[in-house]
Amino acid sequence: MTGSSARAGADNRLRGTAVCSDGEWRYGVAVNLRSITYTSLARLDLDAADLQAIHATAQRENARRNITGLLIFNGTHFLQIIEGEPEPLAQLVENLRRDPRHRGLEVRHDTPIDERSFPDWSMELVQVSAARREARDTVRKRLPDGLPDGVRNRVIRMTEQISGTVAL
């Protein structure tokens, strides 16, 4: 699905260059970025149409807010990493907490970052098997080249956790 993801703006990778939440380009301005990782439990009757709607809305709205990230779904649990400026991220997390399509949203990692791990993905969706090994292998293949080892390892470890073989 990498080719179908909305592009968040490759110029955003350049240090000191960013699209801010007001949509204005600012050069030479230090941009305050954060990365938030959360997990949640999907509604029992969530179907493929619901998942597609979540993905399409996330791509559209995240591109508008200059939020990038990755959404992993294993049929029962979501694992999502979102990156962007603090205010739009806080608003998104509050919206996600109120979304009836999932419950039990738990922020597992929230940290300042110097640069985005997923600069080209307004929201990439990776659907994985509930089986640990298959889920891990699928995620490994889909993660972008050049992803920092710490981020790669966290995504793989948390994918294993939502796959039920490691306690959350």
Can you annotate each of these PLM segments?
Residues 19-168:
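Charge-rich, low-complexity N-terminal segments
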